């Protein structure tokens, strides 16, 4: 099952400007910085020692980004088992777990239509 809130995504116009804000002005450390193409990276920042991180994600890489809100990512150790258990319990998923370079993900909805991400 879910073990913790892993990340909260914040969608930004300028990833480098946001990176400077969170690291230089707020004082967060860079927890991850992996290239995702020529213009962006998978960027996580967090207070020193924190387990939950902010993902600073460029809006330009998201379709419909003008309507994007901050999102929560729940981490688990067995995404396929967790997916099956939650699905059996009546949770609505928006697809099946998808393996990507930086982890395996699947989206699900709560009963009010809020969308969350599950990650292994």
Swiss-Prot record:
<feature type="domain" description="VOC">
    <location>
        <begin position="4"/>
        <end position="120"/>
    </location>
</feature>
<protein>
    <recommendedName>
        <fullName>Uncharacterized protein YetH</fullName>
    </recommendedName>
</protein>
<dbReference type="InterPro" id="IPR004360">
    <property type="entry name" value="Glyas_Fos-R_dOase_dom"/>
</dbReference>
<dbReference type="InterPro" id="IPR037523">
    <property type="entry name" value="VOC"/>
</dbReference>
<dbReference type="Pfam" id="PF00903">
    <property type="entry name" value="Glyoxalase"/>
</dbReference>
<dbReference type="InterPro" id="IPR029068">
    <property type="entry name" value="Glyas_Bleomycin-R_OHBP_Dase"/>
</dbReference>
């Amino acid at each position: 099952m879910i073990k913790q809130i892993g990340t909260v995504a914040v969608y930004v116009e300028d990833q480098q400007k946001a990176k400077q804000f969170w690291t230089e002005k707020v004082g967060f450390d860079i927890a991850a910085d992996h290239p995702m193409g020529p213009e962006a990276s998978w960027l996580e920042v967090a207070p020193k020692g924190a387990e939950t991180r902010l993902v600073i994600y460029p809006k330009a890489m998201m379709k419909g980004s003008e309507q994007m809100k901050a999102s929560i990512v729940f981490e688990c150790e067995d995404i396929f088992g967790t997916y099956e258990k939650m699905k059996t319990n009546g949770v609505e998923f928006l697809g099946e777990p998808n393996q990507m370079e930086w982890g395996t993900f699947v989206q699900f909805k709560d009963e009010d239509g809020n969308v969350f991400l599950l990650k292994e």
